[in-house]
Amino acid sequence: HKDSLNASLALVKGYHSTFPLEEVELEHLYNAIAMRLVIIVTRAAMSKIEEPDNEYLWISEKPAWEVLKKWNKIAPGFAHYSFREACGYKAHPQQEQFNDWASKNKFNISELFPSIDKNNVQHLDLSVASTWIGHQESFNDLDAFQFKIDQLQKKHPQKIIAGGYLEPRVLYTSSAYDKIGNYGAESRTIHLGVDFWLPENTPVHALFDGEVVCAVNDAGNKEYGGLLILKHKTEELEFYTLYGHNTIASVLKHSIGDIIKKGAQITELANYPENGNWAPHLHFQVMLSMLDYKIDYPGVAYHRQMNVWKSICPDPNLLFKSDELAKKNTPTNNDLIDYRKQHLGKSLSLQYKAPIKMVRGAGQYLLDQFGRKYLDTVNNVAHVGHENYNVVKAGQDQMALINTNSRYLHENINELAKELIETLPPELNVLHFVNSGSEANELAIRMVKAVTGEKDIIASEVGYHGNSNMCIDISSYKFDGKSGNGTPEHTHIFPLPDVFRGKYKGENVASKYVEEVQICIEKIQHKGRNVGAFIIEPIISCGGQIELPEGFLSEAYQLVRNAGGICISDEVQVGCGRLGKTFWGFQLHDVVPDIVTIGK
């Protein structure tokens, strides 16, 4: 395992469920594990001397050294708190004590920023699902970000813009926030403090008497810049406060061990790039432990460690007691599922045993509400990546201008038609615009019936062509599936042309699948009717991304046309450049269909 601590937690939790571990035992567990590893490598070294021919005696030496080196890099305190959380205790043993002390004391935000003289807060949502932060491309445009802050401040001149505790964010675009864990890539997204968005050079003052334990220039992209950490003591406990994104000069005037009086000015807010490349703000954080940090401290955590970190770093609003900073209740995934079951039709099904709440797209990834990235190998809507900047911008610009229908003259509909026609063979030069792939295939079948006067359609096994009544009637994927009604009278299905798992396997089987199409034609003609159309995807999508046998499509098209039918290429899921090599799937087969349908 890349993350030995994370791997150990399931073992500790399982052991505790059967043989409960006491809190005092958990204090020593990190060292006990380290000692056991030392014993293993020491005994292996001794065995090599005592019995050099018995390799079994040191079989565990190499993996033990690997784990020991990783274990040595883990902060003992963080391991202790993680073990406590895994066993059902509060991760930090003084969490309740701090909460109790904070509940009996109240501090005003204006004490942090007396020159501003504001206590009320305008909450700013910077979460993964926030529409305020806009497109991912905008995250690092600090001028644009500051402009939006200024506009928000104008709307709320008597309030301080603030927020962010335990907020999952995707603003952290530096690779320093990413790592490879036991289950793949993961990113730190959970914000551990409160951000106060105020102008550069705003003075920051101490909320409590304290002692300087860290005063550094935490240089680097998306770091703190000027960072100050103070230690505070009450009669009952010890805790720390962190002040990030300050001017370097205002921080470095302090030395370790300096005593700070409550109300004293301690720093000034910096602008970018001095503050780590952020719009000006104060990152304010409370900690119950410094762990092993001396010149830095995490301000953002991995989601899987959130319960541990929120115990180590309590909510700063326990001090301020601001309604606006209070964490709002949001529906859980189970709440969303329950509502769907009650009010949404069953056709809107969910994937996975534990459905995922997706709130943002970015290129090849979908992001859940905690900012966790999922490589999207399922959805085919985003031709050029999720939320492609140029596509989003074009849509925003047009929606801000006009959104109407095709009854009026406009250049755009003609320009789109021209661009599509340029990708098609010259024979295909008349377009019909509809709202979806289902409507496109529905219209194609209606045109077939109008032109040929025939109703009989030939389609592939496991083919899918849409969700309207007429499209379901020609979609084996639907009518042969669960709750399907079987093959309709005027639909004729031939076997899925799959050379690996289909009815005919191996090379040179295209002609056998063509013969199956011929059988469908003969059955139609035997009933005294003629073929209306032949419809197929150039790559069968719902059937398993099946490539058609070489030569199959051209021969099948010829048979259908000889019988008076029309050939439809359903490109809804595979067209528009998705295949990479060609813009249209039918171009892979050197054919020209009579009708091409697209959507999505």
Regions of interest found by a model, annotated:
Residues 330-362, 380, 513:
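Active-site-adjacent loop/helix segments that line or gate small-molecule/cofactor pockets in enzymes
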Residues 107-133, 252-274, 280-329:
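Acidic, glycine-rich catalytic/binding loops that coordinate metals and/or anionic ligands
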